[in-house]
UniProtKB/Swiss-Prot annotation:
Coiled coil: none annotated. PROSITE patterns: GNAT. Residues 39-179 form the N-acetyltransferase domain. The lineage of its organism: Bacteria, Bacillati, Mycoplasmatota, Mycoplasmoidales, Mycoplasmoidaceae. SUPFAM superfamilies: Acyl-CoA N-acyltransferases (Nat). GO terms for molecular function: acyltransferase activity, transferring groups other than amino-acyl groups. It comes from Mycoplasma pneumoniae (strain ATCC 29342 / M129 / Subtype 1) (Mycoplasmoides pneumoniae). This is Uncharacterized protein MPN_027.
Amino acid sequence: MDKNTILEFCFFGDRYQLMALKNPNKLVKNKQVKAAFNVFMKHRTTLSATNYMAQIVENFEQFLEYIHDKLQPGKLLALLFKNKQFLGWFCVGQWGNMPVLSFWIDPSQQQSGVALETISFFLKYYQRTLQPRELVWSFYESNQRSRHLANKLGFPSLFYFKKAEPNAPKVYFGTKDFKGESVIETKPYLGWGSGWKVNQMLKPTKNLTVNLINIGFDAYADSQKALLAWFKTHKLTKGQVEVFFNYELCCLCISYNHKQSWVVYSFQQLLAKR
């Protein structure tokens, strides 16, 4: 796409518009994009995940530059509208070798089912079209809503992904078995906020060899305590804990190998080992 593209799709008879922006950093003067960003900034104090971006992004131009700088060629910023009302935004692109899909839904729209329907649509769409070997999912959501939506979609707020072999399914979600392979068991209430039970998060199984686990993290003190307790339980060193807290997106990447040992990498270290 060389210019903005308006796509239309339906959920249960309701018609939505998707504005796909090929070059978001060049659209500072676009009124709809500016309105979308205003909504983003308006709700930033109520969303723990969004707060982090708001600290980096102080104005609209910086927001677009932030998105543009992080996504390599082939990037796409999509803004979702219904009846000219902004509902949320999506980004798809790559960080290093990793395909990345991120989204944010306006909290005022979540009770209407729009968020659930939209997430379902994009999940199926990008699985079908991108077919990434691994997918890192950044979940820009609020505490209870993120868990509720994730549960309704059939997987917990803790997203994890199995490195696919040739001709194997590209992405694994939830706690379902697939062709006899058990995935990691997780608790359905895990997600953003202070309700984490991090020491109960991960139960490795024998059949998995490599897993990349992307855990959203916010700055609540009790979440930090729970995370530290989890690290202690798994006998990880203080240096490895620091890697987690220094991780650029406030996320944790863990590599789990066949020897059942846990190794924590920074994002850059993880890419280097690939």
